[in-house]
């Protein structure tokens, strides 16, 4: 196992009115490791994930991500993605009325020399992404035409393709 640290959370604390949701939480993730957060409802699992992904602002502590100078404190979800943190949630967080290819590349569409979306390249790259996961589907079809389980796999494919350092799966197989 590689000993290279990609993520460190130190002293993360967060309080909701009347409830200490996180109390001085420390967490270290090394390259290649797989972790599972387990606990009862209300134990703080989702809150910790939301702090890491920029959804919740934590009150105390620091988050360090490999290759980023200094601590990452109360960053946004976009900052988290730019720093290599990808998340797939239990609820599919994609656009059902867009094609699979559009969903895979939303916000990072390949462009032509003229600055317009390069649809041919997007479709070709989308087919390659899905083929890498042994999924032979028509990427030009709208996401809503596929089962919820397949939509979840497409969300996972998108997260993996974003060249992430940390991939968080928040109950992604529940559907």
PLM ranges: what are they?
Residues 1-175:
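Glycine-rich phosphate-binding loops of nucleotide-dependent enzymes
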């Amino acid at each position: 196992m590689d000993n290279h640290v990609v993520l460190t959370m130190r002293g993360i604390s967060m309080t909701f009115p009347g409830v200490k949701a996180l109390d001085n939480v420390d967490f270290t993730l090394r390259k290649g490791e797989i972790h599972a957060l387990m606990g009862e409802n209300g134990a703080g699992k989702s809150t910790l994930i939301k702090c890491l992904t920029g959804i919740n602002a934590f009150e105390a502590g620091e988050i360090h991500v490999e290759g980023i100078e200094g601590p990452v404190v109360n960053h946004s979800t976009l900052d988290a993605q730019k720093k290599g943190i990808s998340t797939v949630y239990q609820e599919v967080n994609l656009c059902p009325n867009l094609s699979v290819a559009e969903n895979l590349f939303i916000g990072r569409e390949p462009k032509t020399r003229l600055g317009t979306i390069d649809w041919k390249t997007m479709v070709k790259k989308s087919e390659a992404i899905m083929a890498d996961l042994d999924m032979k589907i028509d990427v030009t079809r709208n996401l809503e035409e596929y089962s919820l389980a397949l939509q979840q796999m497409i969300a996972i494919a998108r997260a993996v393709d974003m060249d992430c350092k940390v991939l968080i799966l928040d109950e992604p197989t529940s559907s």
